[in-house]
Amino acid sequence: MNVLPCSINTLKGLYDISGVEVGQHLYWQIGGFQVHGQVLITSWVVIAILLGSVTIAVRNPQTIPTNSQNFFEYVLEFIRDLSKTQIGEDYGPWVPFIGTMFLFIFVSNWSGALFPWKIIQLPHGELAAPTNDINTTVALALPTSVAYFYAGLTKKGLGYFSKYIQPTPILLPINVLEDFTKPLSLSFRLFGNILADELVVVVLVSLVPSVVPIPVMFLGLFTSGIQALIFATLAAAYIGESMEGHH
């Protein structure tokens, strides 16, 4: 007889959890703009971690690299290889951009699973991975869109726009739409995957003993890394495509 009330209470609990995760925000008024305060806080933490780690690792570069220097050299080599594969021989100027995107997204995604954000109480909302907020993922996707337009115009001048009528002018609307949907697909893919991962872990922790969600958390770490790689790879591929002029 108590099954139905219990089920209703369980569903209500899940609804409350999801409401906290995606519906409440700490708003800051900066000038005439209203921003999500918790996103800025966690983003600053991620940036501080990245800058601090790099500064400590390479402040005293050695001819024979230490462990930390070795690690960052490996990361740089990985990003250079990724950029060269997707962009081509003119990849050099784009390595800092692709590397910044990859590292920020990677650390942001992992921070959602590894950092004890929940113990920090806010007046409204709660701290989570920066990429758990659609504003962050859109802010990452828009510079990518600007970057591939800039790359194409720099390489080809106004002739870049001729690609919209290739192979036939009848495809003009579709080709234009394709370029403007790229940032949407980048931002929503990253946001959806990170949000879903965090919600799944929160729901499992609330329903079952804490040891059970651990495999899901490890899977989330793997997925978070893959999402950072996908974003960086697609960003580099879009830049390379705009410079080469083929789809």
UniProtKB/Swiss-Prot annotation:
Membrane topology: Multi-pass membrane protein
Regions crossing the membrane: 38-58, 95-115, 134-154, 199-219, 220-240
Source superkingdom: Eukaryota
Gene3D superfamilies hit by this protein: ATP synthase, F0 complex, subunit A
Cellular location(s): Plastid, Chloroplast thylakoid membrane
GO molecular function: proton-transporting ATP synthase activity, rotational mechanism
InterPro entries: ATP_syn_F0_a_bact/chloroplast, ATP_synth_F0_asu, ATP_synth_F0_asu_AS, F0_ATP_A_sf
GO cellular component, one term: plasma membrane
Keyword set, alphabetical order: ATP synthesis, CF(0), Chloroplast, Hydrogen ion transport, Ion transport, Membrane, Plastid, Thylakoid, Transmembrane, Transmembrane helix, Transport
Location, primary (coarse class): plastid
Subunit structure: F-type ATPases have 2 components, CF(1) - the catalytic core - and CF(0) - the membrane proton channel. CF(1) has five subunits: alpha(3), beta(3), gamma(1), delta(1), epsilon(1). CF(0) has four main subunits: a, b, b' and c.
The protein's role, per its UniProt record: Key component of the proton channel; it plays a direct role in the translocation of protons across the membrane.
Protein family according to the UniProt entry: Belongs to the ATPase A chain family.
Record protein name field: ATP synthase subunit a, chloroplastic
Source organism of the structure: Piper cenocladum (Ant piper)
Upper classification of the organism: Eukaryota, Viridiplantae, Streptophyta, Embryophyta, Tracheophyta
